A protein has these predicted regions:
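Arg/Lys-rich, positively charged N-terminal/basic patches that mediate binding to nucleic acids
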Residues: 1-33
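Short, hydrophobic secondary-structure boundary micro-motifs
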Residues: 30, 51-53, 91-93
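Basic/aromatic recognition patch in beta-strand/loop cores that engages polyanionic ligands
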Residues: 38, 45-77
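Enriched for short, Lys/Arg-rich terminal
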Residues: 68, 72-97
Length: 97
């Protein structure tokens, strides 16, 4: 299994989303992180499970939350480039590829 590495911009996406959900309801941010952990484990176990959506970048959708994990697979690692809401402008994450 390849390691899953999260780029700093993607880590900032995740932290911002976690904090926003925590302000909406106590514990909801933790639920978001758990859904993210589940998706990252699935990506690590089978990175080709999710479809390529742009120039070798794949997207895994989170359960229960309207977010996608955008990642690229390389020979030695899987790199997460973004974790964004599905309705965001795709150019925002595409500029990170």
């Amino acid at each position: 299994m390849k390691p899953v590495l999260v780029r700093p911009a993607a880590a900032a996406d995740i932290e911002d989303t976690f904090l926003w959900y925590q302000t909406q309801r106590s514990g909801l941010g933790d639920d978001f992180r758990e859904a993210l952990r589940f998706a990252l484990n699935e990506i690590a176990e089978n990175p080709q499970r999710y479809p390529v959506i742009h120039r070798g970048t794949r997207r895994a959708l989170l359960k229960r939350f309207p977010y996608g994990v955008f990642y690229r697979e390389f020979p030695r690692a899987i790199i997460v480039v973004a974790c964004m809401r599905g309705r965001r402008n795709p150019k925002r994450w595409q500029s990170r590829v």
